[in-house]
């Protein structure tokens, strides 16, 4: 894939979710898990989404079970967990791999655009990538970066 907008991962129902529909939006992409110490970040992510969604901001959650088997549920179970426990209204897409031989093209692209400490691989759940309105990956945040600490960067590209 040569461009962010060429990507089309699957949503939780198995339907394509074409990133071409995101043109002109600021996008925060996050690999998520329901049984992780960072899972409470869902609350902060939802707060960011509510604060900025009317200004062209969207968050995409990608569940992943590659770190400590902390996302064992089905796509439907994951979506229900997010809504019930954290009131998540931003899109939570189908479970994917973010590293390894079966890495999803979304993460293959994101990691190639922004390395973390010189490394491409995702180190843990809740790493975040900020994509500007032109589809360029402008920042990558580690798992320990709390959603509220991203506000200045989000504001700067809205």
UniProtKB/Swiss-Prot annotation:
Task: Give EC number(s), comma-separated.
Answer: 1.11.1.24
Q: Which GO terms describe its biological process?
A: cell redox homeostasis; cellular detoxification of hydrogen peroxide; cellular response to oxidative stress; hydrogen peroxide catabolic process
Question: What GO MF terms are annotated?
Answer: thioredoxin peroxidase activity; thioredoxin-dependent peroxiredoxin activity
Question: What start and end residues bound the annotated signal peptide?
Answer: none
Q: What is its main location?
A: cytoplasm
Q: What residues sit in the active site?
A: 36 (cysteine sulfenic acid (-soh) intermediate)
Positions of disulphide bridges: 36-82
- Judging by the UniProt lineage, the source's domain of life is Eukaryota
Q: Where in the cell is it found?
A: Cytoplasm; Mitochondrion
Q: What induces it?
A: By oxidative, osmo- and heat stress.
- Name the catalysed reactions: a hydroperoxide + [thioredoxin]-dithiol = an alcohol + [thioredoxin]-disulfide + H2O
* CDD domains membership: GSH_Peroxidase
The protein's matches in Gene3D superfamilies, at most eight in alphabetical order, are given as: Glutaredoxin
Which leading EC class covers this enzyme?
A: oxidoreductase
Keywords, ordered alphabetically: Antioxidant, Cytoplasm, Disulfide bond, Mitochondrion, Oxidoreductase, Peroxidase, Redox-active center, Stress response
A single cellular component GO annotation: cytoplasm
One Pfam family from the record: GSHPx
Q: Which InterPro entries match?
A: Glutathione_peroxidase, GPX_AS, GPX_CS, Thioredoxin-like_sf
- Family membership noted in the UniProt record: Belongs to the glutathione peroxidase family.
Task of the protein: Glutathione peroxidase-like protein that protects cells during oxidative stress. Has peroxidase activity reducing hydrogen peroxide, alkyl and phospholipid hydroperoxides using preferentially thioredoxin as a reducing power. May act as a scavenger of H(2)O(2).
Q: How does it assemble?
A: Monomer.
The miscellaneous comment for this protein is: The active site is a conserved redox-active cysteine residue, the peroxidatic cysteine (C(P)), which makes the nucleophilic attack on the peroxide substrate. The peroxide oxidizes the C(P)-SH to cysteine sulfenic acid (C(P)-SOH), which then reacts with another cysteine residue, the resolving cysteine (C(R)), to form a disulfide bridge. The disulfide is subsequently reduced by an appropriate electron donor to complete the catalytic cycle. In this atypical 2-Cys peroxiredoxin, C(R) is present in the same subunit to form an intramolecular disulfide.
Q: By what name is this protein known?
A: Glutathione peroxidase-like peroxiredoxin gpx1
Upper lineage is: Eukaryota, Fungi, Dikarya, Ascomycota, Taphrinomycotina
Name of the gene this protein is made from: gpx1
């Amino acid at each position: 894939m040569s461009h962010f907008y060429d990507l089309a991962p699957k949503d939780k129902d198995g339907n394509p979710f074409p990133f071409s529909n995101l043109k002109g939006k600021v996008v925060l992409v996050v690999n998520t898990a329901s049984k992780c110490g960072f899972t409470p970040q869902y609350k902060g992510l939802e707060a960011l989404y509510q604060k900025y969604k009317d200004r062209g901001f969207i968050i995409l959650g990608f569940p992943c079970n590659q770190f400590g088997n902390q996302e064992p549920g089905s796509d439907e179970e994951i979506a229900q967990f997010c809504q019930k426990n954290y009131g998540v209204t931003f899109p939570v897409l189908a479970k994917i791999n973010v590293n390894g031989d079966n890495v999803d093209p979304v993460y293959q692209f994101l990691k190639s655009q922004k390395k973390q400490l010189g490394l491409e691989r995702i180190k843990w759940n809740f790493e975040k990538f900020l994509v500007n309105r032109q589809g360029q990956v402008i920042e990558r945040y580690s798992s320990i970066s709390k959603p509220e600490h991203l506000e200045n960067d989000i504001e700067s590209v809205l």
